[in-house]
Amino acid sequence: GHADPIKNEKSLGAKEKFLGSCKTGFTANFALPLEIKDDSHLLELTERIVKECYVKNGLIAEWATHSDKGNPHLHILATTRPWEEGNFSESRLRIDREKLLEIRHLAAEITNQFGQERGYNYHVDARSYEDRGINLIPSRHMGSKAYHKHNEESRIAHENNEIHQQNLVELLDHPEEILKLVATQKVVFTQADIEREVFKRAGGDMHLYNLLKSRL
């Protein structure tokens, strides 16, 4: 730094401003409905989410879909500065928790509207388990970077295994949580939907599956 405190303060201020301007992009992940098997429908929904949530705000977005282990997700990388008249705007979009939640809720609305138009029986709820009154712990999402870092992948997998075990204990004591969960996932749900969720929560263990099912 400078010996002169005024110059030093200006230098630090300039550095802070520079570092602040370095954040030119942000990422977001969205779970996609398992019910959509048609690739053309999945593409149509994805493009609609990108257009309505990002492009309409002047943001440039790059996206990719992944279906790892039957868990389809949409990954989006977008600019923080809108594209205006052939250049990036001087002002940067404020990307905080509130803004990300706003985008997530809009994406859920778009996904649900698309499902109604195409006749799918699903319902996406962007609210947290807590806000929905569901006493379960959400699992950690393993981002694309984690798949390239063995230690990170192992750590997240270990955490998710612990979460799975804690949720099982909760469900065995309060099996009604499964009904509350399924009710937020479907427009109309059936016994088969409940059984699928029970099987998923049991992790394929038939003993646990039968035990959970018997308590509903």
Task: Show the residue positions of the predicted features.
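Single-stranded nucleic-acid nicking/binding segments centered on His-rich, glycine/basic loops
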Residues: G1-S21, D39, T65-P72, T79-L216
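Glycine-rich, often proline-containing surface loops adjacent to acidic residues and nearby aromatics
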Residues: S21-A31
